A protein has these predicted regions:
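Divalent metal-coordination and catalytic microenvironments
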Residues: 15, 32, 97
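Active-site-proximal segments of metal-dependent phosphoesterases and phosphodiesterases across multiple
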Residues: 1-7
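Active-site environment of divalent metal-dependent phosphoester hydrolases
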Residues: 11-24, 39-40
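Active-site beta-loop-alpha junctions enriched in small/polar residues
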Residues: 17, 35-37, 112
Length: 165
């Protein structure tokens, strides 16, 4: 709210891998997270020491603190220790905003699917979400946004937020 109170026209949060609520504050959108748009887990050749340290893999006989020394086997080890990322991390959206006379009139949410259920070669690459994935994501966004008074309509696989005139 403070950013908008100080002149920001839109505020987007980045960091959470999952979609969160959308709020319209003083006619300006706040996207509390747009989910993931491109994601490439499990595909790294090197897992940096900081990752080991963050996950407290103290039982691993790690030969060096040099990230260059970590190889693909370490990525496999990390996956075994942390488990698979949830499917919700592999969904997101592209947003388009329509303005008239410098005022926001409509937000259109285009759901994307990052291929959690597809082949590894497609994992993390954004594609237009199927009707099922799109509807699930849009219904979730609609529910998350209710406490903020944001009404989301679902039409033809897109989410639409119309602002009062």
């Amino acid at each position: 709210h403070e950013a908008i109170d100080n002149g920001c026209d839109m505020f987007c949060v980045h960091g959470p891998f999952e979609f969160r609520a959308i709020e319209i504050y003083k006619g300006k959108p706040i996207f509390y997270s747009l989910g993931s748009f491109i994601r490439q887990p499990y595909q790294q050749d090197i897992v940096p020491w900081e990752t080991y340290s963050a996950h407290k893999f103290i039982d691993r006989d790690y030969p060096s603190e040099n990230p260059i020394d970590t190889k693909i086997e370490d990525a496999k080890f990390l996956l075994e220790r942390t488990g698979r990322h949830p499917a919700s991390y592999f969904r997101g959206a592209s947003i388009s905003c329509e303005y008239s006379d410098s005022k926001l009139k409509k937000i259109i949410i285009h759901p994307v699917d990052l291929g959690i259920d597809g082949p590894l070669s497609d994992l993390g690459i954004p594609k237009i979400a199927s009707e099922e994935v799109a509807n699930n994501l849009l219904n979730e966004i609609a529910q998350l946004s209710v406490p903020y008074g944001t009404k989301l309509e679902i039409k033809d696989g897109l989410g639409v937020i119309k602002l009062e005139q």
